[in-house]
Amino acid sequence: MGSGGGGCGRNGAVRQYIRSKVPRLRWTGELHCSFVQAIEFLGGQDKATPKLILQLMGVKGLTISHVKSHLQMYRCSRLGSHGTGRRSEMQPQLQRKHSCGADEQVPREFLCPPLKRTRMGTEATYKGMQGSQGISEMRTTGTQYCIDDYMQAMAMERRIKEEGLRWQRDAAAAAAADGGAAASNLQTVGCSVQESDPFKIIKPEVHHLGPVLKLQCSKVENSGFISSSTGTAARDQPEPPPLEKCSLSLSLGPDPKCMPAIASSPSESSCILSSSSRSFSDCSGNSGCLVAPGVNLELSMSICGS
């Protein structure tokens, strides 16, 4: 053991604890209230000293060592329960504020073991993490709601555009159909085309024939042809009352005078081309070419019922 009555020995051993014969002081509620009042009177736990607290308390049998140890425990409890103690104090106050019962004094926890303080700090940290996670979840949910609203608005706008385009197409189709019907109703002169191999004969409709066409028909009987300006003049004239029907026929065939010559040499001549003004033949064979007078082209026009 070390000499001198204190500290550690040369070997580093701890001095043996000697239990005092004086009984330990038990801090009752009254002593603790007196202790707290003395601290508050001195201006707080940082300004209060054990000597001044002991003088203000004035309790018989209370020593300065008792005040020192109790002040140290009080400071530790205040520092440890500063965050969680305030919440635990506010909850009973709120309950008392909203309840109809009598007010109850909130006990102050000044003796707090280290393990309990650690557990309380861990619970507070876990609750704080849960709160931050809930806030982040709320933000994520709000963002998701904004995205859903934006997608719904875009889909609605796209449907409106599609409906507008469909209405435009329907209106254009209806306008085209109405325009075709109006064009068919407003047509003043019409011609019916009849095909007969190998020629096409254009026959004017009967109810559109006018006086000018009658005059041209009489000229056709004398000259044997009809001018292209007849149809234009007929279109320019107003529509007269319906007249008698006319018939127009065109016949094409070989000249009867050339039939013996063609029948006599069918193999020597390959083709015969002729017209009303001039005639020539392009033939291939052993005996040469055969010149024919022409093809008989006659145009006749007569009034039906005459």
UniProtKB/Swiss-Prot annotation:
Keywords: Developmental protein, Differentiation, DNA-binding, Nucleus, Repressor, Transcription, Transcription regulation. Residues 19-79 form the HTH myb-type domain. Gene3D superfamilies: Homeodomain-like (1.10.10.60). One of its GO terms (molecular function) is DNA-binding transcription factor activity. SUPFAM superfamilies: Homeodomain-like. Expressed in roots, leaves, leaf sheaths, culms, panicles, lemmas, paleas, lodicules, stamens, and pistils. Disruption phenotype: Delayed transition from the spikelet to the floral meristem, inducing the formation of extra lemma-like and palea-like organs. GO terms for cellular component: nucleus. InterPro entries: Homeodomain-like_sf, Myb_dom_plants, PHR1-like, SANT/Myb. Residues 50-75 bind DNA. GO terms for biological process: cell differentiation; floral meristem determinacy; negative regulation of gene expression; regulation of DNA-templated transcription. It comes from the Eukaryota. It is found in: Nucleus. Interacts with TPR1, TPR2 and TPR3. Transcriptional repressor that plays a role in the regulation of organ identity and spikelet meristem determinacy. Interacts with the TPR corepressors to possibly repress the expression of downstream target genes. This is Myb family transcription factor MOF1. The gene is MOF1.
